[in-house]
Every structure is written in C-alpha cells, then in structure tokens.
Amino acid sequence: MKVSRRSFLMGMGAAGAPFILPTGLRAAEANGRLNIGFIGMGTQARGLMGNFLHQDVNVVAICDVDTTRREAGCRRVDQFYTEHPEKGKPGNCKGYKDFREVIARKDIDLVCVATPDHWHAYQTVEALKSGKHVYCEKPLTYSIAEAKLVMEASKKYGRIVQTGAMQRSGIEFWTACMLVRNGAIGKIKLVQAHFGGPAKLHFDPNPPQEMEPGLDWDMWCGPGPLVPYDPVLSPRGVHDGFPNWREDDFFASGGVGDWGAHHMDIGQWGLGMDESGPVKVIPATWKSNDAKRGFRATNGAKLVYADGAVMEHGGGSTWGTVFFGTEGIVCVNRGRIAMWHGKEGVPDRTTCQQIQNGSFDGMERVCFFNNEKKFMARQSEIFGNLPEMNGSNEQACAIAARRFNLSQAATQLYRVRGGGHPADFVKCAKDGSQPCSRAEVGARTSIICQLVNTSYIHGNAGFEWDPVKNEFGAGGDNKWLMRRIDGINAGYRNGFFPQV
C-alpha cells in the first residue's frame, strides 16, 4: 500500500534541541487559537487544510485565482465548523483572489502557501515581511537566488517558516537518519535518492484553449511568462489530481523539484548537512532521447560533499533514499524501512536489486518492512516466506531503535510526535522554537534540487559549489543559474522577484 501525501500528513506522529526565534504574537494569540489563511486551494492545499482544521487554529481566509476552488474552500471550512462548533465558528472564512489581501490582514497570524513552485518565494517573503509565520509547500523555492532570500527574510523578520517536506515528521525517516547520524552503518560513502527527472521545455505547448470565466490566468502565471491558457497546466475547478505545471520549466522543476525535495532532503538530514551542502556537482554520463525535455538526462547527477560522501540521483527504486555505509545499508521510504549491518554496502547492480527483498551474505538484517503487499507476495514466491520481515513500519523502526539504543544515542534529531508537520508548525509559531523543516533546511534542499536540475539543463554540466557563500565556483555562470528564470524568458514579470 502506498502512503499518500494526504494520509501521511494526517497520520504521522517534538524532541530535540529547538532553535528559538521571537514570535511576535500577541499574548492572547500565543495562549489561544491562531488565525490562518490559505494561499492556493488546489489538491495539495486541500489535503493540508484537512489537517489544519484539526489544529489549534481558525481558518479565516481562502485565496485562489480560480473562483470555483476559492468558493469550495470557504464552503468546506464553514461545513467543518458547523459540524465541529468546538473547533471554530462558521461564517468567518472569507475568500480572496489576490493573496496580497490575505497577508495584509492584521488579524491573520499564519499563512499556508500551496501555489505552483514559481510563486513560493515571493509569497513567502511578502508574508514574512507582514509579520506572518509561513507554512510553504516544497520545494520552498523555484531558484537558488530565491532560496537565499527566503533564508534572509526569515532571519530578518523573526518569523517561522515550515517547509512542506513532511517526511521529516515520519518515524521511519527519523529512525533511518538517527541510525545513519549515530554511526550504525559506519561512514557514509553514498546516498542514492530516487525520484523523477527534470521538467520539460516549454517550446511545445498545447494549442491555445478557450478559458471559462472565473480564472485570473495572468495572476496564475504571476512571476513567470504569460503563456496562453492551458488546461493541462492548470485544470479548472476542484479535482484530485496533480496538474502538469510540475512538468513545465517555466513553473517548476519536474520530479527533481517535486520528489527530489523529499528524498534528497532526507539525504541531507542523514548526512548532517542541514546548514551546508555539497561542494561539487558531477554530471550524468548520458542524455535522453526525449526532445520535449531538451534531451536532458533524467537521472545520474551526483553531489559531492567535503567529507567525500556522494549523493546520487537514482533511477528508481522501492526505496526513496538509500544510505550505503562502511558497515551496512539503511533504506527508507514512506511507510517502509530496512537495515542491514555487518559489512560495507556496495552499490553494485546485484545489491541494488537485492535491497528490494533484502538478503545479503555476511550481513545481519536488522529490520525489514516493505509495505507493498503485492510486491511482497511476489517476493515470497521467489525467496520463500521471508520470516525475518517485520509486521509493520513502526515495529521495524522499534527493532532498529532498540538494537542500536537510539534513545541514548549521542546525536538526537528533532522528532515530531503527533499531528504531523502542520501541528509542528503551529506549536513552533506559538512557542518561538524552530520547526523540523525550518527556513534554512527547506532553502538548502531547494538549492541542491536546483544544482541537480542545473546540471541537466546545461547538457550534463559539472561545476563547483560553495555551500558557505551559496555561490557557484568553477564551471558555473552565476547570473543565469542563480535566478534561473532570466535564462528562460525576459525575467520576473510584474515585479514579482522577492525583495527582502
């Protein structure tokens, strides 16, 4: 069974030394319910709202450039508060077409930004400047320059940012990174992060489509170019799918910015690189035959860190992130975890195939839970009943935690308990501590996503990177690469480039 984003948000169950920032909340707000406004009301935002409605907040504003979505969001809030009067009062949620009206409201404490990627940075920075704490969907930014500005803005205005890298709220990811950070598999040589390839070039758009009334398409395009309306990019109204703007260079970064922002984020966490990053990018050694992607490679780029560890963009696996160490292997994905211990994990073809079922000569299988019933049934036919399999993700995590005494480990990572990512954000907005996916964490993950993306965009380019200054070294062209969109069109439209 695959774990959806929505169920993951609702179900994941805060220890660790917190980072503290002044919140600026009024005393009554700090002790009571906070007011939150939503910017964007697409599929992901609706999943988030389902969680936030159960938190200690009042949903008072819904903004979307699509009238149907906006009105549906307000109706949902009113219906929820009608059915749950202890949670809030119906009739208090107002709809907006322009997000600037939401962040201008003095009575709103928090905003949730769940718009297409090209809008994230500007809306986040403007909300921070107006005194709001921000929950922003991943990737936190569309470009490297934007990532630097979001970090700067969060510090300057003393407000909290929680990036929607919700895997950090999952017990399996926390356990995997605790094992890795505390040396359970020795020195890390390689991290494989498995996700899709870069976006498509926007040189082959669909024929212009007639647009039904009720959508401000100019505002949807925002900082990006004003392309003809395309329902493939943004279907009208309420729907359950994820639109194809994720696959368009003008508005996103394909799988690199989408799932790379999850699985490489876990790689950064496991490597202890939340406040740093790689020093070099090694390009992929092949190119695709896909003209719509500009013949770009879809995986294979490598990030090299100062200690010699490498994070590689893998081509696909049951596991989202795989750590290969000198004394073992740790694999993790949503709702699943596995660990082998005893000798060096060698990422050859045989090993990469075997981690799907998990049998290695000379290695102890510490825990193994795959959570794919059909997959495991097929493996059982081939390999037998696999009695070492654990009964659940939680059981597998507990076995590994006991085996390596993680409760007493020297390095203790921030752990979210109950309510998941949104609850962590609300708690931190109230008490002034920093959440698990704070601004710098999300920004640095966005940066490595764009380093990988940049390598593909430039025909498998390799270059050096300074993770202290966040600047390109040898092989990099700062102006084009840092702002990115300037190389695609004339620049950010309508002044929508973040200004701190």
Functional labels for PLM-detected ranges:
Residues 299, 304-416:
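NAD(P)-dinucleotide binding in Rossmann-like oxidoreductases
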Residues 10-30, 294, 374-414, 427-500:
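C-terminal helix-rich "cap/oligomerization" subdomain common to oxidoreductases
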Residues 163-165, 207, 246-257, 285-290, ...:
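Active-site rim elements
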Residues 192-239, 343, 350-353, 359-379, ...:
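Core domains of carbohydrate- and sulfate-ester-processing enzymes
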Residues 217-308:
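Rossmann-like dinucleotide-binding domain that binds NAD(P)(H)
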Residues 229-244, 393-400, 418-426:
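Active-site-adjacent bridging/hinge elements
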Residues 133-135, 141-219:
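A contiguous active-site-proximal alpha/beta segment in oxidoreductase catalytic domains
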Residues 1-133, 145-160:
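N-terminal glycine-/serine-/threonine-rich beta1-alpha1-beta2 phosphate-ribose binding loop
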